[in-house]
Structures are given as structure tokens and as C-alpha cells.
Amino acid sequence: AAHWSDWIGNFIDWVEDMDEDKRIVIENLTTRYPGTEQPQLRQINAEVHTGQVVGIIGNSHSGKSTLCHVLAGVIPKIVSAEIEGDWHMFGQRVSDNWPVYNAMNGVVLQNPAGQLSGLADTVADEIAFDLINQGMAEGLIQKRVEEVATQMGLIEQLNLRPESLSGGQIQRLAIATAIVANPAVLIMDDPTSEMDPLGRRQFFQWLAQVKETTVFIVTSEIDDLCEVADVVWVLHEGQMVAQGRPGEVFNHLAADWQIPAPTIQQLAQKMDWHLADGRYPVNDADLKEVRYAHN
């Protein structure tokens, strides 16, 4: 009983702090796996406001997945690693409040099939799994499952077995299970890698409509990311080498980061179209502003 009263007390404190401090702050985060000499993350410092979409990009082995694992609590709770530094959410030290934080986040990692419960007979049951465990009323569960399935384009698959789905549908199912309980933080590591172009476009259209939830997303879909991200973080060899709004980051890429410029930016460079501050446009909104100025 004492354990649950402590948990509830910490949860109430955290929710109250949300109104006072709406930031997520990472301070001097360094992560090293056992048996490795070099850290996978080195002195990461960043700050975002709640409700923002944060795009995490970088080449292979830059530390993107490791950062996701830390943010999700996979490191060190499931995967062993040495961590220095810390991060705070809504003014609370996350490492001191793991049970509370885990109840407030949703996670989609690179192996979405491995995240499914394996206990559900249907897609609907899989989406409902966490809500059932929370003791939600059956009618409310059905309503919420249908809402999330509609958002993820799975409404026609609700009565199918999860293992019968395609790779892209499995990814959408994993996202559905991650968002069904309305998490405060959503962490997604390459969530569209197996989706077809239509599925990917629908996913990013959905992401553009997400409000209040803070989203961390690793993706190589640069064009789509520029349309939805409030902030972009660039990792290179375990270090945060750039962070800022998409237009700021992509107009100052270093060659050794090996990150392609967005298609719109490449077009604008060929046409020599600039925004008023001299930057090249990187998304549709920027491009419309530039074309209006040139007409």
C-alpha cells in the first residue's frame, strides 16, 4: 500500500509541476555500453518545450537509437549501460521517478513486432491491452480503440490477428498501442521504415496534427520531417552537433555529417530562391513565402 501511495503522490507532484515547468531538459548526458571504450553518447545537452515535435537525425552509428533508448527508459532499465548526467521532465528528475515517467510515455522502437504483447487474438485486443490493464470501462475502451485505429489506418484490420499484418501495418499497430493511453511523451525510432509511400505520408499527416504530446522521432525521411518538426537535433559520432528549427539546421549542414538537404532546399538552391533572412526554404510553408516574394 505504501508503494502505491508513494507512486500516486509522485504522480500528483509531477502533474502539478507540468503547469509550472513545461520543459524537457537533458543535461550532460553521456552513455557507454559495457565493454566499449568510447561512449555512444557524449555530453548531450538539449532543451525542448512540451508539445514540440523533435526530429533526431544523423548517419549510421551516430547515437540516435541509443538516445531513444535512454529517453524511453530502455537504458538502463532493460539494457545495461553506464549513464552520466541526467534529464528532467516538467521540473522532475526522471531517474528518480521512473514508474511515473514510464506511465506517461509511449515508445515505438525499431523492432515493432517485439513490442506487441503476443497475448492478443486480434488487432483490436492488442490496441486495447494497456487500457484493459488500467481497468478502463469496456465501452470507453472500444471507443478509444476505434479512434486510434482510425488515426493509424487500421480500422479494417481490427478483427485480424496481429501476426497476419504486413510490416508497415505492424509499425502502425505499434504506434497505435503507444498512443492509445494518451502519453505525455512519445518516442519513436524509425517508425515508418517498413511503410509504403502512402502509409508514410498518412503517418506524417497524422503527426502534424498531434497536439500537447511531446514527440521525439528518429527518421531518415528528411522531407517529411521538415514539414512537421518544431526542432531538429543532429547527432554525429555520439555528439549533438546541431539543434534548432529545421530551416536553421538544414541551412548549416556540415559535409562530414553525411545528411542530405531536403528536396525543397535543393530546388531553391538551383533557382537561387532565398527567404528574407538569406536562408533557403526547407518546407512547403517556406517555399510558398519565397515564391510569393518572387512573383
Question: Across the structure, where does each feature detected by a protein language model lie?
Answer:
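Conserved ABC ATPase "signature" region
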Residues: 139-157
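Catalytic Walker B motif of ABC-type/P-loop ATPase nucleotide-binding domains
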Residues: 186-189
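Conserved H-loop
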Residues: 221-227
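Conserved beta-strand-loop-alpha-helix hinge in the C-terminal portion
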Residues: 239-264
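The feature captures the beta-strand-to-loop junction immediately N-terminal to the Walker
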Residues: 57-59
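ABC ATPase NBD Q-loop/coupling interface
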Residues: 84-100
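Conserved ABC ATPase signature
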Residues: 161-165, 169
